[in-house]
């Protein structure tokens, strides 16, 4: 579980891979991957950071832990691999997108197009045991992903943080730089979406901020596969 980051995140996060918590986490993961089915695949664990470099991050959408069903997780929060049914929270995200922009709901949940435009799709925990939600919670990933958020907080260039639900909003304490923007609402989960996610217009809010900064707006439309 050494530093495999191939872009500017590599040197920024290099110290984390030497820290006690990470060495303990790495030993735990070696054991977990050899004795259980764990998602995502080892080579996909850091995909959020691989697809969206530090310098290119415009938006952060914070998730919790990876999907724990077969062939779903591939290292990007909320996203699933091609050929897999779109999960309920992501379907609600698409419904809000349809209401904001009129986009048709796509036939897939593969969000790489967002990541490639500077949307960091970051879970706070990067691995999970099959069928056991939160099974890798408290094992060390939170220290690592907190550091990712702190590094973005240190940046002069503004970042837009999208915090949906209490779990994501708990990270607000790490975002202290007044340059940055926070967009928050309840989670898009079917349990809460009708209590303030629907109608919150997060996608157009992001693009309004980017346009005001003179930055290229995000094309949120996910193509059919």
From Swiss-Prot:
GO terms for cellular component: cytoplasm. It is an enzyme of class 3 (hydrolase). Keywords: Cytoplasm, DNA damage, DNA repair, Hydrolase. SUPFAM superfamilies: Uracil-DNA glycosylase-like. GO terms for molecular function: uracil DNA N-glycosylase activity. Its main location: cytoplasm. Gene3D superfamilies: Uracil-DNA glycosylase-like domain (3.40.470.10). It catalyses: Hydrolyzes single-stranded DNA or mismatched double-stranded DNA and polynucleotides, releasing free uracil. Its EC number is 3.2.2.27. The active site is at 65 (proton acceptor). GO terms for biological process: base-excision repair, AP site formation via deaminated base removal. InterPro entries: UDG_fam1, Ura-DNA_Glyclase_AS, Uracil-DNA_glycosylase-like, Uracil-DNA_glycosylase-like_sf. It holds the Pfam family UDG. It is found in: Cytoplasm. Belongs to the uracil-DNA glycosylase (UDG) superfamily. UNG family. Excises uracil residues from the DNA which can arise as a result of misincorporation of dUMP residues by DNA polymerase or due to deamination of cytosine. NCBIfam families: PRK05254.1-1, PRK05254.1-2, PRK05254.1-4, PRK05254.1-5, ung. This is Uracil-DNA glycosylase. It comes from Bacillus cereus (strain G9842).
């Amino acid at each position: 579980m050494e530093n495999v980051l191939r872009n500017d995140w590599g040197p920024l996060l290099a110290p984390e891979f030497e820290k006690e918590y990470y060495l303990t986490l790495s030993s735990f993961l070696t054991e977990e991957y050899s004795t259980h089915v764990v998602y995502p695949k080892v080579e996909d664990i850091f995909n959020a950071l691989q697809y969206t470099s530090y310098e290119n991050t415009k938006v952060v959408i914070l998730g919790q832990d990876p999907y724990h069903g077969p062939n779903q997780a591939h290292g990007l929060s909320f996203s699933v691999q091609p050929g897999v049914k779109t999960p309920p929270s992501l379907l609600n995200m698409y419904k809000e997108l349809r209401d904001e922009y009129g986009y048709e709901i796509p036939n897939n949940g593969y969000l790489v197009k967002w990541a490639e435009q500077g949307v960091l799709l970051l879970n706070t925990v990067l691995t999970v045991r099959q069928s056991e939600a939160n099974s890798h919670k408290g094992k060390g990933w939170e220290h690592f992903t907190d550091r990712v958020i702190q590094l973005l907080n240190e940046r002069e260039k503004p970042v837009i943080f999208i915090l949906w639900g209490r779990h994501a909003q708990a990270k607000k304490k790490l975002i202290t730089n007044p340059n940055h923007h926070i967009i928050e609402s309840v989670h898009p989960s079917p349990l809460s979406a009708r209590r303030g996610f629907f109608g919150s217009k997060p996608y157009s809010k992001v693009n309004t901020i980017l346009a005001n900064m003179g930055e290229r707006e995000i094309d949120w439309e996910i193509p059919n596969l």
